[in-house]
Swiss-Prot record:
Tissue-by-tissue expression: Expressed in inner and outer segments of photoreceptor cells, as well as in the pigmented epithelium. Also observed in the inner and outer plexiform layers and in the ganglion cell layer (at protein level). Expressed in sensory hair cell stereocilia, with expression mainly at the basal body of the kinocilium and in the hair bundle stereocilia; and the apical surface of hair cells (at protein level). Located in the tip region of the stereocilia and at the apical surface of hair cells around the cuticular plate (at protein level). Not expressed in the hair bundles of the vestibular hair cells.
Domain EF-hand: 66-101, 103-138, 144-179
Name of the protein in question: Calcium and integrin-binding family member 2
Binding site for Ca(2+) 1: D116, N118, D120, D127
InterPro entries: CIBP (IPR051433), EF-hand-dom_pair (IPR011992), EF_Hand_1_Ca_BS (IPR018247), EF_hand_dom (IPR002048)
Length: 187
């Protein structure tokens, strides 16, 4: 009796703790956030593991993502269905990877997916152009964009193939002291 939570079984909570950087309290807080996004869709009882997809259009309205120029790409990177719709597991994964406790390697893996717009497992000049357009709100002149993209490829392309593989990207991220402090969101 009493106020014991019944949103998840103890086993489910233990599994979430094992697979994320969160404790039980954080997981319950995340469920509350997920529920707030779509109260008519998200159940309060997850003990039977319902599969509910919250549409990307609702996810990107969260304060943590609303102003981010990569909000759709972030949500798509964590979406199992590839359309940006998130299950609770996807939602927890997104917050776990973007939390301050997640290691640089894990963050780099997802950052690479986010910046790989054409999903060819490389960051090519076109991907860099799209990244710059989002970061600068398309305020750079075309010749400036070309110059910046060429310089990034020149500096970061370790194997000289004209594009950045994950190893190139990871090396570049390792040299960016502010990557960890900027690639995160709080619950």
């Amino acid at each position: 009796m009493g106020n014991k939570q019944t949103i998840f079984t103890e086993e489910q909570l233990d599994n979430y703790q094992d697979c994320t950087f969160f404790n039980k309290k954080d997981i319950l807080k995340l469920h509350a956030r997920f529920y707030e996004l779509a109260p008519n869709l998200v159940p309060m009882d997850y003990r039977k593991s319902p599969i509910v997809h919250v549409p990307m259009s609702l996810i990107i309205q969260m304060p943590e993502l609303r102003e981010n120029p990569f909000k759709e790409r972030i949500v798509e990177a964590f979406s199992e269905d590839g359309e940006g719709n998130l299950t609770f597991n996807d939602f927890v994964d997104m917050f776990s990877v973007l939390c301050e406790s997640a290691p640089r390697e894990l963050k780099a893996n997802y950052a690479f997916k986010i910046y790989d717009f054409n999903t060819d497992n490389f960051i090519c000049k076109e991907d860099l152009e799209m990244t710059l357009a989002r970061l600068t709100k398309s305020e750079l002149e075309e010749d400036e964009v070309v110059l910046v993209c060429d310089k990034v490829i020149e500096e970061a392309d370790l194997d000289g193939d004209g594009k950045l593989g994950f190893a190139d990207f990871e090396d570049m991220i390792a040299k960016a002291p502010d990557f960890l402090s900027t690639f995160h969101i709080r619950i």
